[in-house]
Amino acid sequence: LGIKATNIVWHNTSVKRSDREKLLKQKGILLWLTGLSGSGKSTVATMLEQKLNDAGKLTYLLDGDNVRHGLNSDLGFSKEDRIENIRRIAELSKLFVDAGIITIATFISPFIKERVKVKDLLESDFVEIYVDCPLEICEKRDPKGIYKKARNGQIKDFTGIDSPYEKPINPDIVIHTEENSLEECVDKIMDYLEKR
């Protein structure tokens, strides 16, 4: 999408990202968790945020469902709306990262093209984390009861059932929630961040 507004100019401010990061004693970054519904994105992100918070880091967790209660409440689940959902979150995440915040985003984000756009916007501040869990395990978990509804035809365009999920080609981190414990998954991300 292009900018529709005319007669606007970017206003530079005197406080820069480096000033905010120095104040916070941390670097802003976007940790983007992608995977099927029920794969464990929100569960992993919640524990990850707690561990980072316990370590004295300023974080913000952007959860796919929570964001749809406010900022993206006008969006449905058509392909176009999913694309706009991710675009808005990418722009919001860029602002949070510029503020020096460790931003954790948990979005199915089923399309590679849209995740690449997020990466292009955030550049080296983007860390793609693929929460890999087989569809059949996600369906067994079904914490929201939505796979059952999708299989019964009550929900259309449901990712993994009648709408595709495009697996990341070269994610920065892959976690396997059906093979590893929650703690092991979170520790893998923490180890990555410590080495970064």
What are these regions (language model features)?
Residues 70-81, 91-151, 157:
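ATP-dependent NMP and nucleoside kinases share a basic, alpha-helical "lid"
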Residues 1-30:
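Extreme N-terminal, non-catalytic leader segments
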Residues 61, 126-130, 172-174:
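Conserved beta-strand scaffold positions in the cores of enzyme catalytic domains, especially
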Residues 41:
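Conserved lysine of the Walker
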Residues 37:
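The conserved Walker
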Residues 46-94, 98:
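Conserved substrate/cofactor phosphate-moiety recognition/catalytic segment
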Residues 132-135, 140-188, 195-196:
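Small-molecule kinase domains that catalyze NTP-dependent phosphoryl transfer to phosphate-bearing small molecules
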